[in-house]
Swiss-Prot record:
Subunit comment: The basal body constitutes a major portion of the flagellar organelle and consists of four rings (L,P,S, and M) mounted on a central rod.
NCBIfam families: PRK05303.1
Name listed for the protein in its UniProt record: Flagellar P-ring protein 2
Gene Ontology MF: a single term: structural molecule activity
Leader sequence segment: 1-24
Name of the coding gene: flgI2
Family per record: Belongs to the FlgI family.
């Protein structure tokens, strides 16, 4: 009997350890290392080779840009000549410079039309310098565009467009020319910034790092960052960070949350969202105000004057409302399903969710985006 009880105790410990480990996540997914981040690049360029779908005559800076490009190749246009070409489009080129990239490596670029170009399909981006916020050129972009959209137009002017045709990408279209310096090895310690600030998660991170690197290796002043002592040698520091970001940490469990997109009407409900006992009555009130005018015609012998008198009509219509009554602990998903079954609009759903939140019956967080 004692042996059986010991086996049950061991199984319970194993199950608890398994459930805890399943909630754990690598530290690298919970934090970002200060000094290791991406940088944004942007540039202005021209896309050529378009089959009549480029910028029109109203976009004057496109013609000026063409003249500047020709001037670099020794071609000078007479004064007062305005270039007109529907095969060229002025574009903005943007790219993401990953941390640690060195000269010679390639990155993807996004090309977006600035003018009234109808489509960039089939175009080629001319050599375009890409600058960071400090104005320094860090990469050069050039290549053929990949445009996912399709546009077609008939002689009568009717057109059909599928997806976006005024923007495209060039995979591996930019070459790094200058490295962005990093301050990763400038300090004796490394700061880890939590992607989701939490005192509990910061405490768990400090405890996990101390178990790996020894007591006092990590400190935290608040719930947003953790300071970790790191080797001064660059090679040893990289190896230390690789080992550090691989350790498993159990983060704080996120509170139940319901997210409502007011533009699209999308409602996303996280697991565990419940409500307290509540009763909701919601009706649809429609108010219609119309403005018009009537002609006031006096009697023929009355001596009056014909006049136009404004007329306002206000119509109020209220549909039949229903009373919803939910017991304690019911899931919010069931509530939304019940509301939707009555034919309620997304605005009605949002109004009910906001009312539940204001009444304190929503056991979670309501986020409106």
């Amino acid at each position: 009997m004692c042996a059986f009880a010991a086996i049950l105790s061991l199984l319970s410990v194993l199950l608890m350890a398994t459930s805890r480990s399943s909630d754990a996540a690598p530290l690298g997914t919970l934090v970002s290392v200060e000094g290791v981040r991406d940088n944004q690049l942007v540039g202005y360029g021209l896309v050529v080779g378009l089959n009549g779908s480029g910028d029109g005559q109203q976009i004057r800076y496109t013609g000026q840009s063409i003249a500047n490009v020709l001037k670099q190749f020794g071609v000078t246009l007479p004064e007062g000549i305005r270039l007109r070409s529907r095969n060229v489009a002025a574009v903005m080129v943007s790219a993401n410079f990953p941390a640690g990239y060195v000269p010679g490596q390639k990155i993807d670029v996004t090309v977006s039309s600035m003018g009234d170009a109808k489509s960039l399909r089939g175009g080629t981006l001319l050599l375009t310098p890409l600058r960071a916020a400090d104005g320094v050129v860090y990469a050069l972009a050039q290549g053929n565009l990949v445009v996912p959209g399709v546009s077609a137009q008939g002689r009568s002017g009717s057109s059909v467009t599928i997806n976006a045709t005024a923007a495209g990408r060039i995979p591996q279209g930019a070459t790094i020319e200058q490295e962005i310096p990093s301050d990763l090895d400038a300090k004796p310690s490394v700061r880890l910034s939590l992607k989701r600030p939490s005192f509990q998660t910061a405490t768990s991170i400090v405890a996990a790092i101390d178990r790996m690197a020894g007591p006092g290796a990590a400190t935290s002043r608040d719930g947003t960052s953790v300071e970790v002592r790191a080797p001064e040698d660059p090679t040893a520091r990289v190896a230390f960070l690789a080992k550090l970001t691989a350790i498993n940490v159990t983060p704080q469990k996120e509170p139940p949350r319901v997210v409502f997109n007011s533009r699209t009407g999308t409602v996303v409900i996280s697991q565990g969202m419940t409500v307290s006992p509540a009763a909701v009555s919601h009706g649809t009130l429609k108010v219609t105000i119309s403005e018009g005018a009537i002609v006031s015609q006096p009697n023929p012998l009355g001596g009056g004057k014909t006049a136009v008198v404004p007329l306002s009509q206000v119509d109020v219509q209220q549909d039949g409302n229903r009373m919803f009554n939910w017991p304690a602990g019911v899931s919010l998903q069931k509530i939304v399903d019940t509301i939707n079954s009555t034919g309620a609009s997304p605005d009605d759903v949002m109004a009910i969710l906001q009312a539940l939140d204001e009444a304190g019956a929503l056991n979670g967080e309501l986020v409106v985006i």
